UniProtKB/Swiss-Prot annotation:
Keywords: Ribonucleoprotein, Ribosomal protein
One biological process term in Gene Ontology: translation
Database matches in SUPFAM superfamilies: Ribosomal protein S5 domain 2-like (SSF54211)
InterPro entries cross-referenced by the UniProt entry: Ribosomal_Su5_D2-typ_SF, Ribosomal_uS9, Ribosomal_uS9_bac/plastid, Ribosomal_uS9_CS, Ribsml_uS5_D2-typ_fold_subgr
Protein name per UniProt: Small ribosomal subunit protein uS9
GO cellular component: cytosolic small ribosomal subunit
NCBIfam families for the chain: PRK00132.1 (NF001099)
GO molecular function terms attached to this record: RNA binding; structural constituent of ribosome
Family to which this protein belongs: Belongs to the universal ribosomal protein uS9 family.
PROSITE patterns: RIBOSOMAL_S9
Amino acid sequence: MIGNYNYGTGRRKSAVARVFIKSGSGQIVVNGKPANEYFSRETGLMVIRQPLELTNNVETFDIMVNVNGGGESGQAGAVRHGITRALIDYDATLKSELSKAGFVTRDAREVERKKVGLRKARRAKQFSKR
């Protein structure tokens, strides 16, 4: 990639997104596909556009994303986190606005591990009195 890019890494659950932004027309490319093709649900698109809409930069930047790991929801959250960090790299004055919306903080919730003797992380086997 040649040019003046701003970079941000985003993480959510087990997904990791590497986000590159540069001034352009508002095109978002995720893993070589347009964002509306990559994310099958509308909620994924809504999530990744949130920091851009908040800062009024929807048509200002071309965004290129490499994301791997996790599912669709986790990847969308990782992309949002990466876009937020890249916007802060571009203009540090946006940080307070993005922080108030809660986009800067990494959501640390992870899947709880399954325990031995239980069906799932917390679900026990059904108890029978008789």
